[in-house]
Amino acid sequence: MPLRDSLSNTWSHIQGFLFPMLRDEVGPLTDKQKQVVVVLEVAGIAAFVHMWPGLPGRPPADRHAIARAFVAKAVLALPQTNMLIERLIADKTLRRLCGWEHPGQVPSEATFSRAFAEFAEGGLPARVHEALIKETHAERLVGHISRDATAIEAREAPVKAAKPQAPKRRRGRPRKGEVVEKKEPRRLERQVGQTLPEMLADLPKHCAVGTKRNAKGHTESWIGYKLHIDTADGDIPVSCLLTSASLHDSQAAIPLAAMTASRVTNLYDLMDSAYDAPEIKANSEALGHVSIIDVNPRRGGKVAHEDEARAKRAANYRLAEDLRYNQRSAAERSIAA
């Protein structure tokens, strides 16, 4: 079913049936509570959470209810688990939407933390997102995929990763019979022959210090992580990848492209100058896409590149690729949302 028809049918069901039924069952809903209901209905998160009843020992807390509370925590922008618990105890309607009738049934903070850790370890949000994208884009041809990354700040100490020290060698030509170790290939070179799981395992995921130049040309630093996003036309994020903040944007481009190619069919890959690398261009072409990447002038070529761009603007000369590149603003809107 086309994406527009699928969303239209889902919204008609929510507006015409689900909201009236819930209004009779739990009472009037606020706008935020309606947002929680919509996300729960569209994502169908309970289908991705497994329960194992009948096992010996104390029965575990209802993971379906905790998963719904996990969604409510994100929709209501509650940064801490104790804030979610306080909200569930005070808000009867929200509590019943999640699946608990009485305040005493709301689990403790430790139980929530263990369950959330299970969800993160099992990749619950990523699996729900992947299934939703595949379902809604199965019969859709995406024109442009805009690739970008954004900072994710974290309240934890950065981990200093130990860099392997290369063995020192005397300067000059090697002696006769001396074996010179070859340089280890760069990550982009390694990724060309790796599978997606191998590429993902090779990316650093610890908390680190990141530095990025913003749209105004100023350098910003933060402690935490970096979220790499592929955004389709319509500002729809189709693939996301979380890495250390210190990882350069280009290092996540090839695995992110592999994830996106398994979910949607697209024509153009739009990237800024941080992704200007021959391996990324070749990978895009191998997937059957046209890559439009802003030029990264290296080795003193910046002045010549700016002069050429200025001359084109003066002559009102614009290529079709330049017009398509403007679609990359979808990535910025997706990140801002």
Regions found by a protein language model. Name each.
Residues M1-A47:
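Charged, often Cys/His-bearing segments associated with DNA-binding zinc-finger transcription factors
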Residues P28-L76:
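Basic, short loop/linker segments at the boundary and entry of helix-turn-helix/winged-helix-like folds
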Residues P60, V106, S146, L270, ...:
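Alpha-helical architecture
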Residues S273-A337:
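Helix-centered, glycine/charged polyanion-binding patches within enzymatic domains
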